[in-house]
Amino acid sequence: AENLSAFVHALLSFNPDIAALYDTIKAHYPIVLTRDMAKARAWLRKHTRGSQRSGVLVSKTAARFKPLVVDVLGQGDENAVHWFLMDKTDIRSSNYLEDAATEIQVQGLELDYTCVLWDADLRCENGRWRYFNFNGRTAWREEAGQTESSLERRKYMLNAYRVLLTRARIGMVICVPEGNSNKTVDGFPEDATRLPEFYNGTYKYLKSIGLGEM
C-alpha cells in the first residue's frame, strides 16, 4: 500500500522517477491500461475470485460515462451498503460492474480489484494537468481561474483521482476512453463532449510511464 501511494503521488505530480517507482510494484500489483470498458470488465471478472470484490470507480466531476454503459451509484448510505456488501449475484453489488462509485463513497474503503474510469474532467496536456467541469448539457468548461476557490477546486479534483487510484488491494485497470471521432452528415462532431483529444494525452502519459496495454 505504501509503494502504491508513492507511485500514485508520483504519477499525479509528473515525477521523473515514476517509471522506476512502477518497477517496484508491478511484479506483485498489476496495473493495466485500456480504452475499452468491455475489456476492463472482462479483466475484472477474470481476476476476481470467490468472495473477492471488484468495482468501477469514477470521479465526482466525471460526466460522460453513460455512453460506456456506466451509471453512477446513487447518493445515500443504503446504496453504498448494497454496493459494498451484496454478493456477485445481486445487481446492486459492486461486482456487477454497472454502478460506479465516486471518491466520496469509497474514501477510506478498499476493494480487491478496481477499474478507474478516467473521464475528461482531468486531462494531461504538455506535461501538466488541465481541469474541466461539465455544464450538464453541451460542453466542458475549464477550471483555470486564479481565485482561491478555483485553486481549491483544482486541488480537490486532483486529490479525487489520488483516492480512486489507491482503492484496490490487489490490482486495477485504468480505462481512458477513446472518445467519439465520428462526424454527422453535416461534418460536425457526433458528440462534441467526448472528442478523442480530451482523452488521448492522458492515455499517452499513462502508457509512457510503463503501464501495460490490455
List each language-model region with its residue ranges.
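Conserved helicase/translocase motor-coupling segment
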Residues: 1-129, 151
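Short, Lys/Arg-enriched charge-dense amphipathic segments
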Residues: 11-20, 204-214
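C-terminal accessory regions
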Residues: 96-213
